[in-house]
Swiss-Prot record:
It comes from the Eukaryota. Residues 1-384 are annotated as: SEC8 and ARHQ binding. The lineage of its organism: Eukaryota, Metazoa, Chordata, Craniata, Vertebrata. The gene is Exoc7. InterPro entries: Cullin_repeat-like_dom_sf, Exo70, Exo70_C. Residues 238-272 are annotated as: Disordered. GO terms for biological process: exocytosis; positive regulation of mitotic cytokinetic process; protein transmembrane transport; regulation of entry of bacterium into host cell; regulation of synapse assembly. Signal peptide: none annotated. This is Exocyst complex component 7. The exocyst complex is composed of EXOC1, EXOC2, EXOC3, EXOC4, EXOC5, EXOC6, EXOC7 and EXOC8. Interacts with ARHQ in a GTP-dependent manner. Interacts with RAB11FIP3.
Length: 653
């Protein structure tokens, strides 16, 4: 049981807590009442604000919509005014631009094209909106006048600034390709940069708005004339240079043989030099055409529309190309006439030209890509013509060597080298510079097709066979000509000189190697022929040495007195030798052996034989009393006989 005091204390404690809780509850109740009151007040305020906001919205939105409508109306008015201004401006275009169009585009192309753009727009406007308006006719007329002025300006710019390329610059352009050292590229400025830009702008305008291609015809006509005159100027430059300072350097004909004559004996002063100049000039003109045509195409690409470039370029190069082809055909025609005259040295002008044309053909083909077939076929046609005429020249030359009719009146009286031999060798030597070309000519006739499809070895063998044929024909002709001489010894000297000249000429040049391709024993064969003729010549001395040859001498007993018959025989032997020696020396002194080595060899051999025979004869009979006047019969000492033989083949002795 809890004590009364403790229970009383706990009751008071509980009562205190209860009181506190009641106070707290009362505070909370008051707070809730205040909160409710505040909430009611806030709801009332918000309701009032919402009501006012709705009133404001109901009054502002109509105003806003009205304002938007007003702004839209204002914009429409402004656009309408702008359109009206724009339309009205079309009616003023003619008057605003007439002065500029009348004065032309020279010096103010930018402004002029701007005016033309305005006129173009005016034309389009009136055509779409007022096709019956008189203003349309005005602006159309003004547009046509402006277009004509632009076309005229295009022509004027091209005419004024398209200059002929100087020959020196063209030569630099050509030679730049052949220089081994690195050099700056040779740049051709066909038109000043500012002019070029104007021309490009005009051409583009004419293509886009002018609907006219006449300016392309103007372009190719002007540039074609310039190209043609540039090439003709180069040709004229060669002619003038040749008359004053010799033939200009030619990259197309390098390393001309200085020790090899290139022509027959000159009949007309300067004629052969002129042929060289014409040939060199033509070769340079061909190279110039390729380089200038390449440059022209680069220029054309910036001015002419792409789909018209090939056709315009084809037209542009025609005059210059036709000029080259015509000149080439004239060369072929001249060669054909020269063949008829048997002037084969003139025909040789075809060889360097043909070689250069074939070397240049790949570049030619590249330049002419896209041109008409007739244009592309011009060079191959000329090459074929030259191959054909060249092959005919070679064939006729070989036949002419075999059938040369000249005999008596044209035979050298001293037995020296015949003109036919020297000309034949010179002709063959010149072929060395054009081995591939000549071989291709022969191959083209052998196969009836282009020789380019055959290797160089095939052509080389054909050329070797041809040279052997010419040499064989020459040998037959020389044998025939040698029969004109009544003296077999002179005939032998003639053949010896010609055979020796042929052999030496073959050895000095590459001809001997070329001949050896198909005839390995040619050199040995010529040496045998030469030796045979020397032996034939030496037999002419038998009529002299037979008088004193030991086998023909009678035997005398020493100390026995000679009979009259024996003395007379000795006298006849001395006299026969003396007369024969004098006669041969007199005759053969006028003969010629141009080769010093051969001349000395023949003299020495003959001198050795005669001196030995005469010395033995003289030794045997000089002390024999066969005459009272020994000086009458013993006219020469052995040394004198040798001296006389040393003067053979020497008219100055």
């Amino acid at each position: 049981m809890i004590p009364p005091q403790e229970a009383s204390a706990r009751r008071r404690e509980i009562e205190d807590k209860l009181k506190q809780e009641e106070e707290t509850l009362s505070f909370i109740r008051d707070s809730l009442e205040k909160s409710d009151q505040l909430t009611k007040n806030m709801v009332s305020i918000l309701s009032s604000f919402e009501s006012r906001l709705m009133k404001l919205e109901n009054s502002i939105i109509p105003v806003h919509k009205q304002t938007e409508n007003l702004q839209r109306l204002q914009e429409n008015v402004e656009k309408t005014l702008s359109c009206l201004d724009h339309v009205i401006s079309y009616y003023h275009v003619a008057s605003d631009t007439e002065k500029i169009i009348r004065e032309g585009p020279t010096g103010r192309l930018e402004e002029y094209l701007g005016s033309m753009a305005k006129i173009q727009k005016a034309v389009e406007y009136f055509q779409d909106n007022s096709p019956d308006s008189p203003e349309l006719n005005k602006v159309k007329l003004l547009f046509e006048r402006g277009k004509e002025s632009l076309e005229s300006e295009f022509r004027s710019l091209m005419t004024r600034h398209s200059k002929v390329i100087s020959p020196v610059l063209v030569l630099d352009l050509i030679s730049a390709d052949d220089e081994l050292e690195v050099q700056e590229d040779v740049v051709l400025e066909h038109l000043p940069e500012s002019v070029l830009q104007d021309v490009i702008r005009i051409s583009r305008w004419l293509v886009e708005y002018g609907r006219n291609q006449d300016f392309m015809n103007v372009y190719y006509q002007i540039r074609s004339s310039q190209l043609d005159r540039s090439i003709k100027g180069l040709k004229e430059h060669f002619r003038k240079s040749s008359s004053s300072s010799g033939v200009p350097y030619s990259p197309a004909i390098p390393n001309k043989r200085k020790d090899t004559p290139t022509k027959k004996p000159i009949k007309r002063p300067g004629r052969d030099d002129m042929l060289d100049v014409e040939t060199d000039a033509y070769i340079h003109c061909v190279s110039a055409f390729v380089r200038l045509a390449q440059s022209e195409y680069q220029l054309l690409m910036g001015i002419i529309p792409e789909h018209h470039q090939k056709k315009t370029f084809d037209s542009l190069i025609q005059d210059a190309l036709d000029g080259l082809m015509l000149e080439g055909e004239n060369i072929v025609s001249a060669a054909r006439k020269a063949i008829i005259r048997h002037d084969f040295s003139t025909v040789l002008t075809v060889f360097p030209i043909l070689r250069h044309l074939k070397q240049t053909k790949p570049e030619f083909d590249q330049v002419l890509q896209g041109t008409a077939a007739s244009t592309k076929n011009k060079l191959p046609g000329l090459i074929t013509s030259m191959e054909t005429i060249g092959a005919k020249a070679l064939e006729d030359f070989a036949d002419n060597i075999k059938n040369d009719p000249d005999k008596e009146y044209n035979m050298p009286k001293d037995g020296t080298v015949h003109e036919l031999t020297s000309n034949a060798i010179l002709f063959l030597q010149q072929l060395l510079d054009f081995q591939e070309t000549a071989g291709a000519m022969l191959a083209s006739q052998e196969t009836s097709s282009s020789a380019t499809s055959y290797n160089s070895e095939f052509s080389k063998r054909l050329l070797s066979t041809y040279i052997c044929k010419v040499l064989g024909n020459l040998q037959l002709n020389l044998l025939s000509k040698s029969k004109v001489y009544e003296d077999p010894a002179l005939s032998a000297i003639f053949l010896h000189n010609n055979y020796n000249y042929i052999l030496k000429s073959l050895e000095k040049s590459e001809l001997i190697q070329l001949v050896a391709v198909t005839q390995k024993t040619a050199e040995r064969s010529y040496r045998e022929h030469i030796e045979q003729q020397i032996q034939t010549y030496q037999r002419s001395w038998l009529k002299v040495t037979d008088y004193i040859a030991e086998k023909n001498l009678p035997v005398f007993q020493p100390g026995v007195k000679l009979r009259d018959k024996e003395r007379q025989m000795i006298k006849e032997r001395f006299k026969g030798f003396n007369d024969g020696l004098e006669e041969l020396c007199k005759i053969q002194k006028a003969w010629a052996i141009p080769d010093t080595e051969q001349r000395d060899k023949i003299r020495q051999a003959q001198k050795s034989i005669v001196k030995e025979t005469y010395g033995a004869f003289l030794h045997r009979y000089s002390s024999v009393p066969f005459t009272k006047n020994p000086e009458k019969y013993i006219k020469y000492r052995v040394e004198q006989v040798g001296d006389m033989i040393d003067r053979l083949f020497d008219t100055s002795a």
